[in-house]
Amino acid sequence: MGDWSALGKLLDKVQAYSTAGGKVWLSVLFIFRILLLGTAVESAWGDEQSAFRCNTQQPGCENVCYDKSFPISHVRFWVLQIIFVSVPTLLYLAHVFYVMRKEEKLNKREEELKVVQNDGVNVDMHLKQIESKKFKYGIEEHGKVKMRGGLLRTYIISILFKSVFEVAFLLIQWYIYGFSLSAIYTCERDPCPHRVDCFLSRPTEKTIFIVFMLVVSLVSLALNIIELFYVFFKGVKDRVKGKTDPYSHSGTMSPSKDCGSPKYAYYNGCSSPTAPLSPMSPPGYKLVTGDRNNSSCRNYNKQASEQNWANYSAEQNRMGQAGSTISNSHAQPFDFADEHQNTKKLASGHELQPLTIVDQRPPSRASSRASSRPRPDDLEI
């Protein structure tokens, strides 16, 4: 049998532009048809005419009887079948090459327009037309070709023709040979003088190969039908998706990341929405705060306020025993909008401002001891 490498290379290029069913079909075609046909089947039918014998000495009788029994050799019949079922796939490959050629032209045109755009010329409309053509041809980013539009129709037509050819060759084989071979063939044809019996070489072995090729043809036909339904439903799904989201083919912008807000601490216990309140009080000092989930921070009750001031007074007395002087500016009261009694007591209070960014590291012992010492710039009461 001839060299199948040229056809194999062409069909191998279709792998990158086929569905999963198409890749399986090509694997079946290569392994169970072309490979088997070029090795075992050809050797089994190599002596079919030379080993065909009839019980007559009439010249030419064996030739006419062989021609009547086998109008075409099984091997040549299967070669024709492989060629016919491969032609639609090759036509689809030609369409893919056409789309790739179009892609090269569109990319070249797009680069030229971008160069002109850098000079200040408005070419947005032309660029949009190029993007529309790429989407129409099924061209995506990085040179990837997607089945869409005319390419999808060509693929569906190729599957239909492959299925039709499979069925047609199965019917022709059944009509000419059947799916089994007999050991004896009866022939009555000129120039045979009478009805003669002719004998076939290795009929059982040939019958096994015939049945095997029949099964492979049925499997290929089933794969074509499954792939046809898959591509059909995939096309319907893409069409529905395109109607719901007509701009799905364009690149989507990635959402910008939210910048984290700085970590501020407040005298009244409120903290920034994204950062927890940093520890601001000395050791042993408790500050009862309200619920931080409330953004207004106005839900503090009177008991919490009294507890805060009691803790603060106790700490002030303890620090006073150590000989430190506390600045009056540090003893500002808390400002509550809904506590009128507290605002009357703390008439000297001012609106509290948020501190700057708080260092998350805990204060060292040296710094805590140094903070209790009086400084020259402290205001004395």
UniProtKB/Swiss-Prot annotation:
- The organism is Gallus gallus (Chicken)
Gene Ontology annotations of biological process type: cell communication by electrical coupling; cell-cell signaling; heart development; microtubule-based transport
Which keywords describe this protein according to UniProt? Cell junction, Cell membrane, Disulfide bond, Gap junction, Membrane, Transmembrane, Transmembrane helix
* One annotated GO molecular function: gap junction channel activity
Member of which family?
Belongs to the connexin family. Alpha-type (group II) subfamily.
What are the record's GO terms for cellular component? apical plasma membrane; cell junction; connexin complex; intercalated disc; mitochondrion; plasma membrane
The transmembrane segments are 24-44, 77-97, 164-184, 208-228
Classify the protein's membrane topology as the record does: Multi-pass membrane protein
Q: Which residues lie on this side of the membrane: Extracellular?
A: 45-76, 185-207
* Positions of the UniProt region annotated as Disordered: 338-381
Q: In which tissues is it expressed?
A: In all tissues, but mostly in lens.
Q: What is this protein called?
A: Gap junction alpha-1 protein
Disulphide connectivity of cysteines: C54-C192, C187-C198
Output the PANTHER family linked to this UniProt entry: CONNEXIN, GAP JUNCTION ALPHA-1 PROTEIN
**Where's it mainly located?**
membrane
The subcellular location is: Cell membrane; Cell junction, Gap junction
Q: Which SUPFAM superfamilies match?
A: Connexin43
Pfam families per record:
Connexin (PF00029), Connexin43 (PF03508)
Give the InterPro entries listed for this entry: Alpha_helix_dom_sf (IPR035091), Connexin (IPR000500), Connexin43 (IPR002261), Connexin43_C (IPR013124), Connexin_C (IPR034634), Connexin_CCC (IPR019570), Connexin_CS (IPR017990), Connexin_N (IPR013092)
> What's the subunit arrangement here?
A connexon is composed of a hexamer of connexins. Interacts with TMEM65.
Question: Where are stretches of biased composition, namely Low complexity?
Answer: 361-373
What this chain does, per the record? One gap junction consists of a cluster of closely packed pairs of transmembrane channels, the connexons, through which materials of low MW diffuse from one cell to a neighboring cell. Plays an essential role in gap junction communication in the ventricles.
Gene label: GJA1
**Cytoplasmic-side segments:** 2-23, 98-163, 229-381
